[in-house]
Regions:
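N-terminal amphipathic alpha-helix/helix-capping segment at the start of soluble metabolic enzymes
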Residues: 1-29, 128-130
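Hydrophobic faces of well-ordered beta-strands that scaffold small-molecule active sites
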Residues: 24-30, 53-57, 77-83, 100-102, ...
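Active-site mouth loops of central-metabolism enzymes
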Residues: 13, 20-39, 58-60, 77-85, ...
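Alpha-helix-loop-beta-strand connector modules within alpha/beta enzyme cores
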Residues: 62-83, 119-132, 196-205
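Short, acidic/polar
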Residues: 35-46, 85-91, 164, 221-228
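Conserved anion-binding
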Residues: 105-177
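Glycine-rich, proline-tolerant flexible connector loops at the mouths of alpha/beta enzymes
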Residues: 31, 36, 49-75, 104-112, ...
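Catalytic alpha/beta core domains of metabolic enzymes, predominantly
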Residues: 147-230
Length: 230
């Protein structure tokens, strides 16, 4: 199928390169307790065999991060990690993954005395030192409060869009270009709208598409297809 695509820049994530006309990469995630190394490795191998180019692993604590090192050694897969609320875990996980995802809204919760710009510069530095790409992962349920309060309660898209654009601008400013962006909502119509608006503003940035809290089949499949096929 010949899909119309924006002329985005190339972003290397481990052995995979996205954007710039490269094949669309598929990412899945494990549903195991990360500290159960055997089960997590088994699931990563199964996902890779099924066609996943990247696999996201949950890391919510330092113990998870320690398990990640062994998981990476055993599988050799292109791993991605979501930092959740503790962005400082980046320096622990970065040596073992191909991509780090951070949520701009979650940066607000940890070390509140620091400006978000300082935190992003730290993340970009860690990523660069460890040959990692990054994903700026904006989510409707956890938008930066400073952005959210600027808009009406019924407008969930504008604060997400502003947040993503601001983070892209900062990463551009400091010269970190190995990043993609995701803008997710549980409503596929909102996903379509916010991603189209972002792509119009930043056609150079590769998109990571997804529907948050999509749910189990068949509902999850239906929501995802609606969002992806527009």
């Amino acid at each position: 199928m010949d899909l119309p695509r924006n002329p985005t820049r190339a972003v290397r994530i481990g052995s995979v390169t996205i954007g710039d006309g490269n094949p669309i990469a598929v990412q899945s995630m494990t549903a195991t307790h990360t500290q159960n190394v055997d089960a997590t490795c088994e699931q990563i191998r199964a996902l890779t065999a099924a066609g996943a180019d990247l696999v996201r692993v949950a890391v919510d604590s330092r113990k998870d991060a320690e398990a990640l090192a062994e998981i990476s050694r055993r599988t050799g897969a292109n791993l991605s990690v979501d930092l959740q609320e503790n962005y400082r875990l980046a320096e622990v996980v970065a040596p073992h993954v191909a991509k780090i995802r951070y949520n701009p809204g979650h940066l607000y919760h940890h070390e509140r005395s620091k400006r978000w710009q300082e935190k992003v510069k730290y993340l970009a530095g860690v990523a660069a030192e460890n040959d990692c790409a990054m994903r700026v992962g904006v989510n409707c349920g956890s938008v930066d409060p400073a952005k959210k309060e600027k808009y009406d309660d019924d407008d969930s898209i504008s604060p997400m869009l502003e947040s993503a654009l601001d983070h892209c601008a900062l990463l551009d400013e400091i010269g970190f270009t190995r990043f993609c962006v995701s803008l997710k909502d549980s409503d596929p119509r909102q996903v379509i709208d916010v991603n189209q608006r972002f792509a119009a503003e930043r056609p150079d940035v590769p998109l990571h598409l997804g529907v948050t809290e999509a749910g189990m089949p068949p509902d999850g499949i239906i929501k995802t297809r609606i969002a992806f096929e527009q």
